[in-house]
């Protein structure tokens, strides 16, 4: 069937901001509206904002601009994208010191399951670039005349931890930037993660995306179980500590609308 260009309107709720199996000690629930244009050639652009819904800190916490190219054939799929991040100065998100990323993904359908490989680099103005790699295994199961899709998914992620060191320096609870600590130089003194540049397995994650399509609407719900790996050794002026990583359950739910097209 001939491809067509389309616009997607999306509204999603995320129960917490989790990245590489890490999150802040204070949850960051987001309401995320987005608008994307997908050209039939494969090029796309997307804009979204993340509104922090906690009553005591409600604000627009993040604005994202993404552009890239995607390829889809019967067996092979690929994605190349770049994203620019604009975080609120008060954000305590685990990613809040990241300013941009470049990501490439290549997937192949083996019939029994689909395997995807991902490589990405994340940039920050205050530290070196992080490099990550990931492997994903998933299997789509269809029902209700293919309108219902359930996709059991397993991911392994690995990489460096400069982003985590920056988070501990500026945003960890008790060490916040923003309104109360905006010009306080003491909040970023001598915090370091041992072997921050070393490539380690950071997260094992299981998820179960569930999608239901009705005409041009798509309803989705995805539970995630993250099992973080490679506990960081953190050095401060006062002490050296080994962090105690805990497994994380989080979820998202949303509704999307396709304009002038139907999702295949």
Label every model-predicted segment.
Residues 1-44, 48-52:
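Short glycine/proline- and aromatic-enriched beta-strand/turn motifs that initiate or cap beta-hairpins
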Residues 7, 29-33, 63-67, 100-104, ...:
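Hydrophobic, lipid-facing positions within transmembrane beta-strands of outer-membrane proteins
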Residues 9-15, 37, 45-49, 80-84, ...:
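Transmembrane beta-barrel strands of outer-membrane/channel proteins
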Residues 20-29, 44, 51-62, 86-98, ...:
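Solvent-exposed loop/turn segments connecting transmembrane beta-strands
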Residues 41-46, 74-80, 111-117, 144-149, ...:
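Repeated loop/turn-to-beta-strand initiation elements of outer-membrane beta-barrel proteins
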Residues 65-66, 72-74, 78-81, 87-90:
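A broadly used, surface-exposed interaction patch
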Residues 83-85, 93-116, 121-141, 146-148:
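Eukaryote-skewed repeat-based solenoidal scaffolds used as protein-protein interaction platforms
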Residues 122-246, 250, 256-264:
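Outer-membrane beta-barrel transmembrane domain signature
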